[in-house]
Amino acid sequence: MTKLAQWMFEQYVKDLNLNNRGSPSFRKWLTLQPSLLRYSGVMRANAFDILKYGYPMQQSGYTVATLEIHFKNIRSSFANIYWNRDSEEPEYVCCCATYQSHDGEYRYRFVWYQPFIEAYNAIETALDPLETIILNLIAARDLDFVVHIFPYNKGHEDYLASTQLILKIFIATLLMDILRIKDNTLDVHLNSDYIIVMERLWPHIKDAIEHFFEAHKDLLGYLIAFRNGGNFAGSLRPSCGQKIVPLTIREALQINDINLAVWREVFIMQECSDLVINGIAPCFPIFNTWTYLQGINQIFFENTSLQEKFKKDFIARELSKEIIKGQKNLNDKEFKKLSLHQIQYMESFLLMSDVAIMITTEYVGYTLQSLPGIISRSSYVSPIVKNILTDEDSFMSLLFDLCYGAYVLHKKENVIHADLHLNNMTYYHFNPTSFTDRNKPGKYTLKVNNPVIAFITGPKVETETYVFKHIDGFGCIIDFSRAIMGPNHAIKLERQYGLAFVNTFYRNQSEHILKVLRYYFPEMLTNRENEIQGVILSNFNFFFNSITAIDFYAIARNLRSMLSLDYLHTSEVKRNVEISQTFLDTCQFLEEKAVEFLFKNLHTVISGKPVEKTAGDVLLPIVFKKFLYPNIPKNILRSFTVIDVYNYNNIKRYSGKAIQTFPPWAQTKEILTHAEGRTFEDIFPRGELVFKKAYAENNYLDKILQRIREQLANENLR
């Protein structure tokens, strides 16, 4: 272990605050060993460093190209390329088709361009036959690549035309996805048009692809650079993902205004990321940064819901024209002036700007919608991962991860997710204790005996600690675009925007809450909507605690749905994976208890009485009782190897929002002090200058905002 790694481990463990409560035997049992560093939460700390120093981005100033393939009357985008300002060479590439989603377009495999192109060039000779096939299809006009550049840049267009970069990016993307198809690990919600393109292309490339995989097994490791962007400091490396959301004029102008859904999501993502780096919970992706992309229009996006946004934009513009035409017949100048101002204000919420926000975060694995198919069909899934669907302790570990994530979201952040469907929950295979050999499917080596993860969930510490089998990763919660903000945010909102804003914010949110309740519990609202809305507005503090049950109900209902998928109960699948009825019963039990908590406490609130506890306070000890530390026999505890601990009692001492609030193990001065003579560039090849430039103040963002204001004021509609 290097001095730097040893120091990071010691600093991380110190900040977990494990030595101040509980019996001596408990504290001794909970001790993390330095030899187990690579399996612990320290690796998430390392992931934070890699994301911040490996993927720095300024908040504006990028040109983005979206790459499309057109083949046999089907088209799909498959990658993005990013240039910083007027630089000739790209800075980042994202080799991935989009996922189907409602609020934005998500892709993973967002990587630094330099290691990507170095890796491709290293294996290009072996890919010559595949390149030739693609080029022949282009020459025959059967296949075409189409590029859209936002904002348009002739220099970047010429650069792409004079190189084979588009071809290389397509082949890299294709290789990774065909390998995932081969391994049965392709996500079920990947863009369907892209999958059709691959299916139609397969007869042409089948022989070349299979030859590459068979004859060049020694080169498959280079594909990691296409997914993870290289390897810093010899460490396990996280993947980075991007989410791009088109912005209305109002959303683009009012940065960090949590009254707007996109900024509310950014705020919650940042707060949840801080839960990870402070050792409170592992259940969320680490937030990296956001940046504005300019010149974006409808052509950039593929998902239907985003296309609808641009259709509404067109309708709003047409309506505005008609309204303003009608103003010409008005004589009252003051009324006309006021009316125009109101129209502009309302337009700003409907009209699309030419700006999109790109958010980069840690990629936290397969969604639970995809996981059963991957576990039941892939030969490269280790028994530890397969046990999630076959072993009660492993399944309960995943279930607890998700429930604990909801618990800390409610208690620490005063937020309800409100949209926990299967594609918003993931399994993150991040720090495995077992390793497979690609040449020997089904064979694996276990590096740690009986690894477990401990969660301290409350101030009583020892009696509120849960212990679970480590499942080579953990469950994660993603996508906060429909979240409900609790009453604790009112003080901050009032300080920033005034009391009138707060009242409007929570009044608007009450409509969203009713919509969520209507979706999950339609019978509850029968003839009672006005009454319940009145309670939301008059006594939201206690009402909020009551409806925290929504997230637990959604977790249980959707996991039960996942376990009930028809294909999991076919004879073919049951030979490999047989779902225990116990899993279904547990989900049913959690579902029923969540409903019981919700209805009981809603009646309490309506009757004017307080509800002090959240759903997690009540449900965790009931559903996971056997996993509490005091309930586990001592001889069993002694057989466990504790490799990770999370402590609910920790405060959020550190934050990823600004350099000065980074944890010590992410501060450049501290890192170099323990680097044993290595330079910053030795550890993080992007270099410190690139990072500091990304976090430096600049006026590019101000220029974008000023241009949008002028665009709104000088609309041709006026």
Curated annotation (Swiss-Prot):
Keywords, in A-Z order: Late protein, Virion
Location relative to the cell: Virion
Induction details: Expressed in the late phase of the viral replicative cycle.
UniProt superkingdom: Viruses
Primary localisation category: virion
GO cellular component, one term: virion component
Family to which the UniProt record says this protein belongs: Belongs to the asfivirus C717R family.
Name this polypeptide is given: Uncharacterized protein C717R
